[in-house]
């Protein structure tokens, strides 16, 4: 959600797309906050549960991968001169490490909260970003003849 505001681009985002994104994020925030604050029962012992720690580690790792990958993409655009192939970090393995990071991030949230609300958002994130990652990968391969042949779309060595 923050990424478009960090980019300096001559292209415009359609108002409907922006409003739908804001609406979805507001609904998601409300559903997850409501679950955690009213419906979820988290005793203090939950903080020692392996699911909480695994979820927290996945969330932090996904957030880091997402932020670093977005920074790499922003730096590519800052120099002007058209599109270029990103390199380094998660881009060594996949075309859309920012999407992979976001998927890992929200999967971690789902595990840490052990909730239907968290799982629903993780599944939505996968359903939304996996096809976009595949489309980005096709675009890179079609646009750049020397695009790394061993780079996958979303999952290193797999997809």
Language model segments and positions:
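Hydrophobic alpha-helical cores of multi-pass transmembrane domains in eukaryotic membrane proteins
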Residues: 1, 19-30, 57-64, 107
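Short capping loops/turns at secondary-structure boundaries
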Residues: 9-19, 47-50
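Internal transmembrane alpha-helix with an interfacial aromatic "cap," most often the third helix
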Residues: 1-15, 28-40
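Long, highly hydrophobic alpha-helical transmembrane signal-anchor segments
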Residues: 22-54
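Hydrophobic transmembrane alpha-helices
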Residues: 41-159
């Amino acid at each position: 959600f923050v990424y478009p505001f960090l980019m300096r681009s001559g292209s415009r985002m359609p108002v409907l797309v922006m409003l739908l994104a804001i609406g979805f994020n507001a609904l998601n925030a409300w559903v997850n906050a409501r679950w955690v604050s009213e419906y979820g029962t988290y005793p203090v012992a939950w903080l020692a549960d392996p699911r909480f720690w695994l979820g927290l580690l996945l969330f932090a790792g996904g957030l880091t991968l997402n932020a670093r990958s977005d920074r790499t993409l922003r730096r590519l655009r800052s120099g002007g001169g058209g599109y270029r192939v990103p390199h380094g970090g998660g881009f060594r393995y996949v075309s859309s490490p920012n999407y992979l990071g976001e998927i890992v991030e929200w999967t971690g949230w789902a595990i840490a909260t052990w909730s239907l609300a968290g799982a629903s958002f993780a599944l939505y994130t996968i359903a939304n970003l996996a096809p976009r990652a595949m489309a980005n990968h096709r675009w890179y391969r079609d646009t750049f003849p020397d695009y790394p042949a061993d780079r996958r779309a979303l999952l290193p060595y797999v997809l």
